[in-house]
Amino acid sequence: MKLVLMPDVNITVDGKKLTVPAGTLLIEACKSVGIEVPSFCYYPGLSLQGACRMCLVKIEKMPKLQTACTTVVAEGMVVSTEVDEVRQARKAMLELLLANHPLDCPVCDAGGECELQDMTFAYGAAESKLIDIKNHKDEQQWSPVVYFDRPRCIMCYRCVRVCGEGMDVWALGTANRGSAQLIVPNHSDYLECEECGMCIDICPVGALTSGAYRYKTRPWEMKHVGTVCTHCADGCKTTLGVRRS
């Protein structure tokens, strides 16, 4: 059986010419030359979701904006990531994400390292055209470790995918459809798993938080040190957040 090597592909992104391997996702091709395309649902190593629509880009000869996280590069592709049409589309998506998002950044554990917060500053979506009353839902404690603040959730599905595809546990899923869709644990109102914390770590906002960390410190007050995980006998390397030590 012969191994067939795919030829490299030449594309242009924001006027920069680059050569990348065939089959590369456009979002990764942009990243390789320092062009950061925003995205909430995309995460390397996980299946493609295309849910948040924040990575929209303009591709020459295509009638509509395309999602960079699901588009594979093609020879001669000409891409624009920062034209006004793209920025306005991203701003509109942010307004929808913020429609029911609580304004609790000062007390949210993700404040200061929240990807939604960063994108709001970057695209100036601080003022919304929507005047509807926000739907408030009480926070839920799924386990001694995992807390879920539903109004903060932006339905990026990162937690569901990392739990299933990354950890092979499948303790998280979804319920309902459309605007009523939400993340749910495997036992309706509580979570039965090994409590590895991957869902908390991968959450781009403050929807999933740790019981040991909640409301105790701020991200910029922490320093990080390498250590060995004591969760089981495998001895995996991990990074520990430390304060006042």
Q: Where do the model's predicted regions map?
A:
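Extended, non-catalytic structural segments that build the interaction scaffolds
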Residues: D14-K16, F148-D149
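Fe-S ferredoxin-like electron-transfer domains
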Residues: R53-E192, I200-T230, D234-T238, R243-S245
